A protein has these predicted regions:
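Membrane-interface segments of envelope glycosyltransferases acting on lipid-linked substrates or membrane lipids
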Residues: 1-112
Length: 112
């Protein structure tokens, strides 16, 4: 199974810590091929690299960040994942539609 994860969290809270543990655990499973995209964060990148994951860092900026959605789409098209798992609202909103299952893990509480 090919899984792409995109984490747009800025800080390092509970969801971000779980994401790092999950990505590092997936890295040890032979039946999972994964690609990891993260918001620019040297600490998170170092923790992932320590687990054998080589993350791709993107800006995941605000509403005027037009580069990240294009770059994310390009990486998805190159990798051709079965599943895209997005973490946090920003990554979810920047994820294009495609021929994959999209699973969104949103953080915090939202007034829907």
């Amino acid at each position: 199974m090919k899984i792409m994860q995109a984490m747009a969290g800025a800080g390092f809270g509970g969801a971000e810590a779980f994401f790092v543990r999950l990505a590092n655990a997936f890295q040890r499973v032979n039946s999972i091929e994964q690609k990891v995209i993260i918001r620019e964060n040297p600490n998170r990148a170092a923790l992932l690299r320590a687990g054998g994951v080589e993350p791709i860092e993107m800006k995941f900026g605000g509403r005027f960040d037009f580069a990240t959605p294009r770059a994310l789409k390009r990486e998805i098209n190159k990798f051709n994942p079965d599943v895209v798992l997005t973490w946090m609202n920003r990554a979810t909103l920047m994820c294009p539609k495609g021929d994959f299952v999209h699973v969104a893990r949103l953080g915090g509480y939202y007034d829907l």
